[in-house]
Amino acid sequence: MAEVPEDYDSGPDEDGELEPERPELPGLHKLYENAEPDTMAKADSKLPAEIYQEPQPETEEEDFKEGEPDSAKNVQLKPGGTSQEGIAKESKRDVPSETEPGIHQEVKSETSREMGEFFKDLEAPMDETHKESDLEPPEEAKPNVTEDVFLESAMETDPDPVPPTETMSEVSGATVRERNLELLEEETEPGVPEESLRVQHEETGLEPPEQTKQDFPSEKLGESLEETDLQPPKMTKPETPEETQRESTEKKRTEPPEQARLEFLEKEPRKSSEEAGLEPPEETQPEVPEEMQRKATEEKGTELPERTKPDFPDHKPRKSTDENVPEPLEEIKLEFPEEESRKTNEETILEQSEMMKPESPEEIRKSNEKKNPQPPEETGPVLPQEINPQVEEKTQTKPTEKILELPDETKPRETHVEFSKEDRPEPIKSKYSVGNDELEHREPKRGKLSLSDKFRKEYYALGSLRESEESIGTHYEFLQPLQKLLNVSEECSYSDPSESQTELSEFVHEKEVVDLSQELKERVSEDDETQPEKGTELQFEHLNWDPEEVAEWISQLGFPQYKECFITNFISGRKLIHVNCSNLPQMGITNFEDMKAISRHTQELLEIEEPLFKRSISLPYRDIIGLYLEQKGHTGIKSDSLTLSEFVKAAGLQDYAPEITAPEENEELPCTEP
């Protein structure tokens, strides 16, 4: 192993920065010093999430912070004597077993100095990421097994004093991959070639997409540490659907479910974040190689789906996305890297949550296998929309089918009508036929009695009448008496059939007469309710006559010579009330006989009755019409609008109406207008 030169000194600030890391490092070093490869495999299998997943975001974050250039691999060949790649491979395979406790004590102090100078050199281009590393020492100290290893390998592979930033960037890029490849070899498949494992490491190293998604835009756009502190709650969002699917699929899978599910769910956000990093701004990452990351994306699209094809059929459409749509995605996502990465990550989270709600993971796999030949752009956001409408259509069509089937099967009203039509006539017809048969069979026995054709016709007509009434459903009361009569006719068949004939005919006629009388009474009662007002209007229509009409009426009575008298005195219909024998001489009519005739006709027209001395005094007579006409004779708004019914109600003369006879007497006369 190559030692650090003696000339190398670290500043006091550098040692002070990493003081919180020192108490936690020796324990972790001893864990890997004394561990053999077998025990390392067990420890890695037990803690895949703690040891494997946590270092990756930190180390990958540092890789992209440094902006790993193409020279990262070429610089490895600069030191004379040994090649960086060979030593890196040796350290990849033998680091856990070759490390010795004596060397680790030296390395521990050296690593602290190296890390101090490393962060000091990174202060100028990246102040914010330097603040992240200063403010998060506990997070680095816990998973820093791989950092310690790559620092040791950095000490081994630095025979010449190279500037610390270059050596750290080189060693971090190489040893992080090598260390994680070693962990992957122990976890997954020991016989897989190194290249495929390296590709898998590059993918799984980026598995927590929320960190990489948030780290790349924050480095490029210079986001503050406060934004990066908000990352842990974003990590917890996709973990909940992942854990629920992990429980359902742990029994059927051999690979670590969390890694595979992360690859399956969030390959698109990783791809977008990596492609967003292809052309970074010149200030922060001037030397990021495009070819190297394009190789990573192409290898991801080609090699990894072959390995995970039986478990995750959705990699096939995503492979075609890598092949078909690299250029548009580069153009779009370089313009808005942060927005695109967030959108794609949110879409995948929404897809997973929507897919988990209606279906189980097995059904999701089946639907994905069926929809593999579809274009890849559709499979992302369109899958839940395709699955959900199917479920909705099924759930909607089932109740509609039931609803459509129910009226066809049950139909209670129609069956009730059919039964009423079918069942009721049958027993009646049977009785009727039995009655005919009995009558016909008994006729020759008696010899004297025979049913005439006329009786038969009427009998059949009666049956048809019964059926028609039954079908209409109006005269159900007629059926029961008819059946009783039929039974009576059967019992009385020994007697003269003319008697039964007459009884039936009489009954039918009586029933029809009763029905007609009831209908007439109802109609008359309705007419009585509506006609009184019309009758009163017609009765007192003459009150609306003008003087010309009154003069015409006088001429019709046979007194045309008095027309001018009525016109000149303006005798209208309402003034006829006051025309009597005492008033006619004032108008110029002096003939007594003519006066009596005109007075009598006006009383008849107005229906004014003279009191009769012969009538009973049990109920004193009240001339309702006379009193009404007395009120109507006055001029005014009330008298103009007054009607007989209103007058009777207002005067309280209901008891004295001609139709009603009441014992009580009301002798008070209503007040009249002055």
Curated annotation (Swiss-Prot):
Residues 1-18, 276-290 have a biased composition (Acidic residues). It comes from the Eukaryota. GO terms for molecular function: protein serine/threonine kinase activator activity. Residues 1-448 are annotated as: Disordered. InterPro entries: SAM, SAM/pointed_sf. Residues 545-608 form the SAM domain. Residues 87-142, 195-223, 236-274, 291-322, 330-346, 354-372, 391-429 have a biased composition (Basic and acidic residues). One of its GO terms (biological process) is signal transduction. Signal peptide: none annotated. This is Sterile alpha motif domain-containing protein 15. It comes from Homo sapiens.
